A protein has these predicted regions:
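Electrostatic cytochrome c docking/interface patches
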Residues: 21-42, 131-133
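A short hydrophobic/aromatic micro-motif that marks alpha-helical segments and, especially, helix-coil
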Residues: 17, 112-113, 124-127
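Bacterial N-terminal signal peptides
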Residues: 9-17
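Periplasmic/extracellular electron-transfer cofactor-ligation site
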Residues: 34, 40, 44-67, 99-101, ...
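Extracytoplasmic electron-transfer domains, predominantly the class I c-type cytochrome c fold
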Residues: 66-122
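Positively charged n-region of N-terminal signal peptides that target proteins for export
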Residues: 1-6
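Short, solvent-exposed loop/helix junctions and linker helices
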Residues: 33-37, 41-44, 79-84, 110
């Protein structure tokens, strides 16, 4: 019986390690006009009420929310929840933000969530030019 238990434990460990090795973060798909268009439609359907038409966090109910919705018009590198990283924005859309009004959107397909990522990043202000010395 001890040998059988060892085989079961070893097999379970192997399956766990294999599953962990195969699990990977989703990679961003290539940004295409079609994907961006899809993201803009999803944004209008699901995000405008809080984040506003311009992505400035000034939607119809945005001012009533605490904390205020994210302002996507700041430079992408300055976003609190993203800091210039598309995967971080994808994670926020997928998982939401605890203790805020930002709900998870995991019910959307992976492609739809990436489409939303590209749509909200479109609102970002361009990088400030670097000063020459």
């Amino acid at each position: 019986m001890g040998k059988l238990l060892q085989v079961i434990v070893a097999g379970s460990l192997l399956l766990f390690l294999l599953g962990t090795a195969l699990a990977k973060d989703p990679s961003p798909p290539k940004k295409t006009p079609e994907l961006l268009s899809q993201g803009k439609k999803l944004y209008e359907q699901n995000c405008v009420t809080c984040h506003g038409l311009k992505g400035d966090g000034k939607g119809q109910i945005g001012a009533a929310l605490k904390p205020l919705p994210s302002n996507f018009t700041k430079p992408f590198s300055q976003w609190e929840d993203g800091k210039g990283d598309l995967k971080k924005v994808f994670d926020v859309i997928t998982k939401g933000i605890p203790n805020t009004s930002m709900v998870k959107w995991s019910q959307l397909s992976e492609q739809e969530r990436w489409a939303l990522v590209y749509a909200v990043v479109e609102f970002a202000a361009p990088k400030a030019p670097t000063k020459k010395k």
